[in-house]
Amino acid sequence: MCWRPLCRLWSYLVYVQAVPCQIFQDDTKTLIKTIVTRINDISHTSVSAKQRVTGLDFIPGLHPILSLSKMDQTLAVYQQVLTSLPSQNVLQIANDLENLRDLLHLLAFSKSCSLPQTSGLQKPESLDGVLEASLYSTEVVALSRLQGSLQDILQQLDISPEC
């Protein structure tokens, strides 16, 4: 029996499957870089992503190893925080986060993963109080931590994260 044609077919199928995954991964990286540029364009004093600010503990910090699911959950929290801010500066970034989460879902799907829906997350109870007390600090801390998280996600995408 001749296996050579089957081997060629298999290598072709592997290549065809890898292309969409790579396209989604490249698009995701490009959007992350765009969001980081938008954050840099907003002139705020830089705050360390590791710095603790009272009342803002619900805003995710840095996570060294992220799965696609954890990336999506983290971005969902940031999206929720940014959409709660009245600042016009963060509207486009919040929209970009929604698009980024959609790309992560496509990337997960292309890897035969399914990400849980996180669109119905509960709003952190302390968010309204913090926003009322200090809008500016919340925006600065959220954007600073988001930027750090996006850099982590970018690095994780280079090593092909798990589901």
UniProtKB/Swiss-Prot annotation:
The lineage of its organism: Eukaryota, Metazoa, Chordata, Craniata, Vertebrata. GO terms for biological process: cellular response to leptin stimulus; energy reserve metabolic process; lipid metabolic process; negative regulation of apoptotic process; negative regulation of appetite; negative regulation of appetite by leptin-mediated signaling pathway; negative regulation of gene expression; ovarian follicle atresia. SUPFAM superfamilies: 4-helical cytokines (SSF47266). This is Leptin. It is found in: Secreted. InterPro entries: 4_helix_cytokine-like_core, Leptin. Pfam families: Leptin. Key player in the regulation of energy balance and body weight control. Once released into the circulation, has central and peripheral effects by binding LEPR, found in many tissues, which results in the activation of several major signaling pathways. It comes from the Eukaryota. GO terms for cellular component: extracellular space. Keywords: Disulfide bond, Obesity, Secreted, Signal. GO terms for molecular function: hormone activity; peptide hormone receptor binding. Belongs to the leptin family. Disulfide bonds join C113-C163.
